[in-house]
Amino acid sequence: DWTRWTCDSKAVIEWRYIDGSKNIVDLRLKDEDDVVHHLEQEPAAVGAFYSDGRLGFHLENDEGLVYWVETDDLIGRGCKAR
């Protein structure tokens, strides 16, 4: 099942862990034709960070931040279930 969150920018994301280890996340942006981004966990100072080199997803305390890695353009922060 997908977890659906809305960000402060009103961007809607859906994401899920694809295995029990929580090392890989599938994430889709609802305004991007439902393209599924397959994100792998990378080192993070705080929380958990996942990326595919294009999209970055940072999780901390049941909130997320999503951005485009190459341009550092923010898609949304404060993403959570609403």
Regions found by a protein language model. Give the residues of each.
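Cysteine-centric segments in proteins
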Residues: 1-82
